[in-house]
């Protein structure tokens, strides 16, 4: 056993199991056993941040650290981590390196937390006003270049027609308004003439009257009697033109009777 190896070099007479147990207990739990290691104490806020360095008195870094971790905050942290539970004695925390200091009385004050630093100027992509101005200029340019005019002669002096001609390259193209004004007699021609109105244009009545007989050279259809056998066809559409017999699509020849 491991514990028996630590015993002194002497003759051991094993009489019973109780003597072996007593020897093991004396070897492991005796007065000469080493003390267990104690953990390190929790470092205080002063030990972490209050570093003694040789710096000039007007060093801005030291002033910033002192303003952030004031003596009141350090003393309050030491008081919270102190093992003493007496509140009266914890108000005075003696230290060998800083002397005896008392936590000063704290009072509220109004602080301005606004940032007055000048940031970098915004870029062109982030300038919202510039984006709005560019969009308004683009809309204004489109509205000025594309407009529905109503010139006396359709297609001449019309800004909308010029816009389409520049974009398409066709010099004869017209806008929708000029096209409807130029060809309104085709778009809005009446379907039939009214009985009580006189036609304004020299044209025949619509629809025309049917009174003439057809000429003699017109080819007339001749009726043909269908035979019992189905005639040869070129496509399936010819088979669907008539007949009561079912459609036979098989390729074998039918026997002749």
From Swiss-Prot:
<feature type="region of interest" description="Disordered">
    <location>
        <begin position="26"/>
        <end position="46"/>
    </location>
</feature>
<keyword id="KW-1048">Host nucleus</keyword>
<dbReference type="GO" id="GO:0039645">
    <property type="term" value="P:symbiont-mediated perturbation of host cell cycle G1/S transition checkpoint"/>
</dbReference>
<feature type="compositionally biased region" description="Low complexity">
    <location>
        <begin position="75"/>
        <end position="91"/>
    </location>
</feature>
<keyword id="KW-0553">Oncogene</keyword>
<comment type="function">
    <text>Plays a role in viral genome replication by driving entry of quiescent cells into the cell cycle. Stimulation of progression from G1 to S phase allows the virus to efficiently use the cellular DNA replicating machinery to achieve viral genome replication. E1A protein has both transforming and trans-activating activities. Induces the disassembly of the E2F1 transcription factor from RB1 by direct competition for the same binding site on RB1, with subsequent transcriptional activation of E2F1-regulated S-phase genes and of the E2 region of the adenoviral genome.</text>
</comment>
<dbReference type="GO" id="GO:0042025">
    <property type="term" value="C:host cell nucleus"/>
</dbReference>
<dbReference type="GO" id="GO:0039563">
    <property type="term" value="P:symbiont-mediated suppression of host JAK-STAT cascade via inhibition of STAT1 activity"/>
</dbReference>
<keyword id="KW-1123">Modulation of host E3 ubiquitin ligases by virus</keyword>
<feature type="region of interest" description="Disordered">
    <location>
        <begin position="75"/>
        <end position="103"/>
    </location>
</feature>
<feature type="compositionally biased region" description="Low complexity">
    <location>
        <begin position="200"/>
        <end position="209"/>
    </location>
</feature>
<keyword id="KW-0945">Host-virus interaction</keyword>
<keyword id="KW-0805">Transcription regulation</keyword>
<feature type="short sequence motif" description="LXCXE motif, interaction with host RB1 and TMEM173/STING">
    <location>
        <begin position="113"/>
        <end position="117"/>
    </location>
</feature>
<feature type="zinc finger region">
    <location>
        <begin position="158"/>
        <end position="178"/>
    </location>
</feature>
<keyword id="KW-1105">Inhibition of host STAT1 by virus</keyword>
<feature type="region of interest" description="Interaction with RB1 in competition with E2F1">
    <location>
        <begin position="43"/>
        <end position="51"/>
    </location>
</feature>
<dbReference type="GO" id="GO:0052170">
    <property type="term" value="P:symbiont-mediated suppression of host innate immune response"/>
</dbReference>
<feature type="region of interest" description="Interaction with UBE2I">
    <location>
        <begin position="79"/>
        <end position="144"/>
    </location>
</feature>
<keyword id="KW-0899">Viral immunoevasion</keyword>
<dbReference type="GO" id="GO:0008270">
    <property type="term" value="F:zinc ion binding"/>
</dbReference>
<dbReference type="GO" id="GO:0006355">
    <property type="term" value="P:regulation of DNA-templated transcription"/>
</dbReference>
<keyword id="KW-1130">Modulation of host ubiquitin pathway by virus</keyword>
<keyword id="KW-0010">Activator</keyword>
<keyword id="KW-0863">Zinc-finger</keyword>
<feature type="short sequence motif" description="Nuclear localization signal">
    <location>
        <begin position="252"/>
        <end position="257"/>
    </location>
</feature>
<dbReference type="InterPro" id="IPR014410">
    <property type="entry name" value="Aden_E1A"/>
</dbReference>
<keyword id="KW-0479">Metal-binding</keyword>
<keyword id="KW-0862">Zinc</keyword>
<keyword id="KW-1090">Inhibition of host innate immune response by virus</keyword>
<feature type="short sequence motif" description="PXLXP motif, interaction with host ZMYND11">
    <location>
        <begin position="104"/>
        <end position="108"/>
    </location>
</feature>
<keyword id="KW-0922">Interferon antiviral system evasion</keyword>
<dbReference type="GO" id="GO:0039648">
    <property type="term" value="P:symbiont-mediated perturbation of host ubiquitin-like protein modification"/>
</dbReference>
<feature type="compositionally biased region" description="Basic and acidic residues">
    <location>
        <begin position="94"/>
        <end position="103"/>
    </location>
</feature>
<dbReference type="Pfam" id="PF02703">
    <property type="entry name" value="Adeno_E1A"/>
</dbReference>
<protein>
    <recommendedName>
        <fullName>Early E1A protein</fullName>
    </recommendedName>
</protein>
<comment type="similarity">
    <text>Belongs to the adenoviridae E1A protein family.</text>
</comment>
<keyword id="KW-0804">Transcription</keyword>
<keyword id="KW-1078">G1/S host cell cycle checkpoint dysregulation by virus</keyword>
<keyword id="KW-1121">Modulation of host cell cycle by virus</keyword>
<comment type="subunit">
    <text>Interacts with host UBE2I; this interaction interferes with polySUMOylation. Interacts with host RB1; this interaction induces the aberrant dissociation of RB1-E2F1 complex thereby disrupting the activity of RB1 and activating E2F1-regulated genes. Interacts with host ATF7; the interaction enhances ATF7-mediated viral transactivation activity which requires the zinc binding domains of both proteins.</text>
</comment>
<feature type="short sequence motif" description="PXDLS motif, CTBP-binding">
    <location>
        <begin position="246"/>
        <end position="250"/>
    </location>
</feature>
């Amino acid at each position: 056993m491991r514990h028996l190896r630590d015993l002194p070099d002497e003759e051991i007479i094993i009489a019973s199991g109780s003597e072996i147990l007593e020897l093991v207990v004396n070897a492991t739990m005796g007065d000469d056993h080493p003390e267990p290691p104690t953990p390190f104490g929790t470092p205080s806020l002063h030990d972490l941040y209050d570093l003694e360095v040789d710096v000039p008195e007007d060093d801005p870094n030291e002033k910033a650290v002192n303003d952030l971790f004031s003596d009141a905050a350090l003393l309050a942290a030491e008081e919270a981590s102190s093992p003493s539970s007496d509140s009266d004695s914890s108000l005075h925390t003696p230290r060998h390196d800083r002397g005896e200091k008392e936590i000063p009385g704290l009072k509220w004050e109004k602080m301005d937390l606004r940032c007055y630093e000048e940031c970098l100027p915004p870029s062109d992509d982030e300038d919202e006003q510039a984006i709005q101005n560019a969009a308004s200029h683009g809309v204004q340019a489109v509205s000025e270049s594309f407009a529905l005019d109503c010139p006396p002669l359709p297609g001449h002096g019309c800004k909308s027609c010029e816009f389409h001609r520049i974009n398409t390259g066709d010099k004869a193209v017209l806008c929708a308004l000029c096209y409807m004004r130029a060809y309104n007699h085709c778009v809005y021609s009446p379907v039939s003439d009214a009985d009580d109105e006189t036609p304004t244009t020299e044209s025949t009545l619509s629809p025309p009257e049917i009174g003439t007989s057809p000429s003699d050279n017109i080819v007339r259809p001749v009726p043909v009697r269908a035979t019992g056998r189905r005639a040869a066809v070129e496509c399936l559409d010819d088979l669907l033109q008539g007949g009561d017999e079912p459609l036979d699509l098989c390729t074998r020849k039918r026997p002749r009777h």
